[in-house]
Structure formats: C-alpha cells, structure tokens
Regions:
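N-terminal Sec-pathway targeting helices
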Residues: 2-16
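A surface/extracellular/periplasmic glyco- and lipid-processing/surface-interacting theme
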Residues: 2-4, 38-41, 46-102, 107-362
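ASCE RecA-like P-loop NTPase motor cores
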Residues: 19-21
Length: 362
C-alpha cells in the first residue's frame, strides 16, 4: 500500500512538473507573440497617424496657387506690390514668395511687375518698389488685395485717394518704405513685412477676404495634373516685350517654367533662386495714350484673345471682363473656364499690335 502511494505521488509530481513546464512555455511563448503583435499594432498606428490627409494636410487652400496652406493664411487678404523692372532695379527682392505676378508695359515699353503675396511675413526686403499705374489698381481689385506702391501717375491719384481701393503709398504711409544705398534713386525704394503690416494697421484696412469672396481661378486637385489637349508644344515662351526681352523655359522634370530677362536668369536676391511658375497666361489687350502723350492706359473690359500655357503645352484662349472692378475670366475653346495647375502663375499683358512678337516654341 505504501508502495502504491509512492507511485501515485510520483506520477502526480511528474504531472505537476509537466504542467508547470507547459505553463511556462505558454507564458513565455504568449509574451513573445504579444510583443510582436504590439510591434505590429504600433507600426500600424504610426502609419495611420502620419499618412491620412485629414491630419497631415493643412485645412486652408491658397486663393493664389490652389495649394495647401494654413487656414489662417488662406483667409488673409493678399498684398499686391509694384515692382520696378528696369535693369537698374534688379535684382529683385522677395518676389519669389509671390503666388501671382502680373507683368504689363508702361511708358517707354518697359514693364513693371505686380506681385501678389499671401506669405511674406519673414521678408525684410521687398522691392524695389515703384509707382502705380491705374490699370494695376484693377488687377489688384480682382484679388481683393491691398495695393502697395511708392508714387503714382497723375491719372491714378484720385482713384488711389478715394475709397475704391485699399492702398499703401508714399502719400499715406511713407514710413512703411525705406531706401538703400546699393543703387541710385528712384530704384532704391523697398518695403518689408513689418513696413507693410504696420502701414495696414495704421490705415485700418481689413485683413481678411471680404465676405463672399471666391477664388479667382479654378485649380487642379491634389495629385491631379492638367495636360492640355492642344498639340502645340510650349517648351520656350518669349513674351515679346522689347526692353527686358523676357522668356520662360520649361523643365519637364518638375513641370515648372523658369524665367529669364535681360539675357540672364531672373533671380530673387533674398534666396538666390530663379523665378519660376506652373502657369502662364498671356492676355492681348488694346492700349492707348493719355492726353499727355506718354502715359499708357489699357482697355481691360470687354473681351479678347490670349494664350494659356502649362505643363509643356499651350492653347489659345479668350478673356472676358464685364466691368472694371470685376473679375477677368479666361475661357478655353469650348467656352469653359480654364483650370490651372497648382502653383504660381504669371499673367502677362501684351498689346494687340505686338501679339506677333510672342513666340511659343518647342
């Protein structure tokens, strides 16, 4: 009997030992599997918190470029700065930050640029800044922009002093500008983010887009690339302006048009980058002289022809504008508004009599 008890006890002990070993194996094995599972889950969580557009993408969309920007910046009125563009005034400063640039002739067949900015907050040097011509006021109004200039033609003064346009000029905010010693006057006048913002505050201008304002342009959506149906290749675009002789060259790798003028790259001296854009609009317009026989005026209402150039191709378009303070629409051959690729745009006003000087080639 005693022997049987010992046998039973031995068997029980063996069973217990086996059970303990099994539990340990299970415990260690489970722990190992749990660790792998946790790693997998951690990796999955990391991916879902960094990839989704709802968290990674800013909420705002730029009215100027169609690109994602901060919501605060997207609601901020742009400023439109008049840039001097004769050879004594270059290199330009700060213009690479602009989302839209207008180029148009003034007297003597030189051009001036009007650069529209949303994001200029860190710029200490913007310019050089030059005087206003009346038709530039209407360009600025199309974007609900605050217009910045230093000086003006006599034909623009009454308009600027009225409440028709919010503007920062030498007659109402001279302290917002400063002069440098690196070039001679009048080509050495500059402003800055601080100068612009302090002037806007002083003049008590509205800082957000007006109620109901809608984007001037329609832009491609994310990951969409507009490719024109036209067969006309546009790898080089000469604008036909006789003095600065500007042109753009298309880079297929990044889809950008890089700008040249005065025989060399058009550079922003604040970052040493060559100016470039995703879209070019050429608008043919009628121009006349004021009674003084030298000041230029442009007919911006009615309709006319032009070119839309993007992604290596060009197509003929028409433009329409019903009233001076209205919005210019650009239409394709089917009568639909053009859709632009996201990014910067240059809008170039060319007098009808010089339309044949515009050259678009392979």
């Amino acid at each position: 009997m005693e022997k049987n008890k010992k046998i039973i006890a031995g068997i029980a002990g063996a069973v217990a030992l086996i059970a303990i070993v099994a539990v340990c194996i299970f415990a260690f094995g489970s722990g190992k599997e749990k660790k792998i599972t946790e790693n997998k889950e951690t990796t999955t969580v990391a991916e879902t918190t960094t990839v989704p557009e709802t968290t990674a993408q800013p909420k705002g969309i730029s009215m100027l470029t169609g690109e994602h920007i901060s919501e605060k910046l997207a609601d901020k009125r742009p400023v439109a700065v008049m840039y001097n563009n004769i050879i004594n005034a270059i290199p330009h400063s700060g213009i690479d930050n602009a989302g839209i640039v207008y180029e148009a002739p003034v007297e003597g067949s030189i051009t001036r640029l009007m650069a529209l900015f949303e994001n200029y907050g860190k710029l200490k040097k913007i310019g050089s800044v030059r005087s206003c011509r009346l038709y530039y006021c209407y360009f600025a109004l199309e974007w609900d922009a605050i217009y910045c200039h230093f000086g003006q033609s006599k034909y623009a003064l009454d308009f600027l002093k009225s409440d028709a346009i919010d503007n920062v000029g030498s007659f109402n905010a001279e302290s917002g500008y400063y002069r440098t010693s690196d070039r001679v006057a009048p080509h050495n006048c500059f402003t800055s983010a601080k100068g612009i913002d302090s002037s806007i505050k002083k003049l008590d201008y509205r800082r957000k887009y007006k109620n109901g304002y809608k984007s001037h342009f329609s832009f491609a959506t994310d990951n969409e690339k507009i490719s024109l149906q036209s067969t006309k290749q546009a790898n080089k675009v000469k604008l036909g302006y006789p003095v600065n002789k500007p042109w753009f060259e298309y880079n297929q790798k990044d889809g950008q048009y890089y700008r040249f003028q005065y025989g060399k790259k058009h550079i922003d001296d604040q970052n040493n980058k060559q100016l470039h854009c995703s879209n070019i609009i050429i608008q043919f317009v009628n121009a006349t002289l004021y009674p003084d026989g030298k000041s230029l005026d442009m007919t911006l209402t009615g309709s006319g022809n032009g070119w839309f150039i993007t992604n290596g191709k060009a197509e003929k378009i028409t433009w329409k504008k019903d009233q001076k303070k209205g919005r210019t629409t650009y239409l394709d051959k089917s009568g639909k508004e053009i859709v632009l690729n996201q990014g910067k745009t240059w809008i170039c006003m060319v007098q009808n009599e010089y339309s044949n000087d515009v050259k678009i080639s392979k």
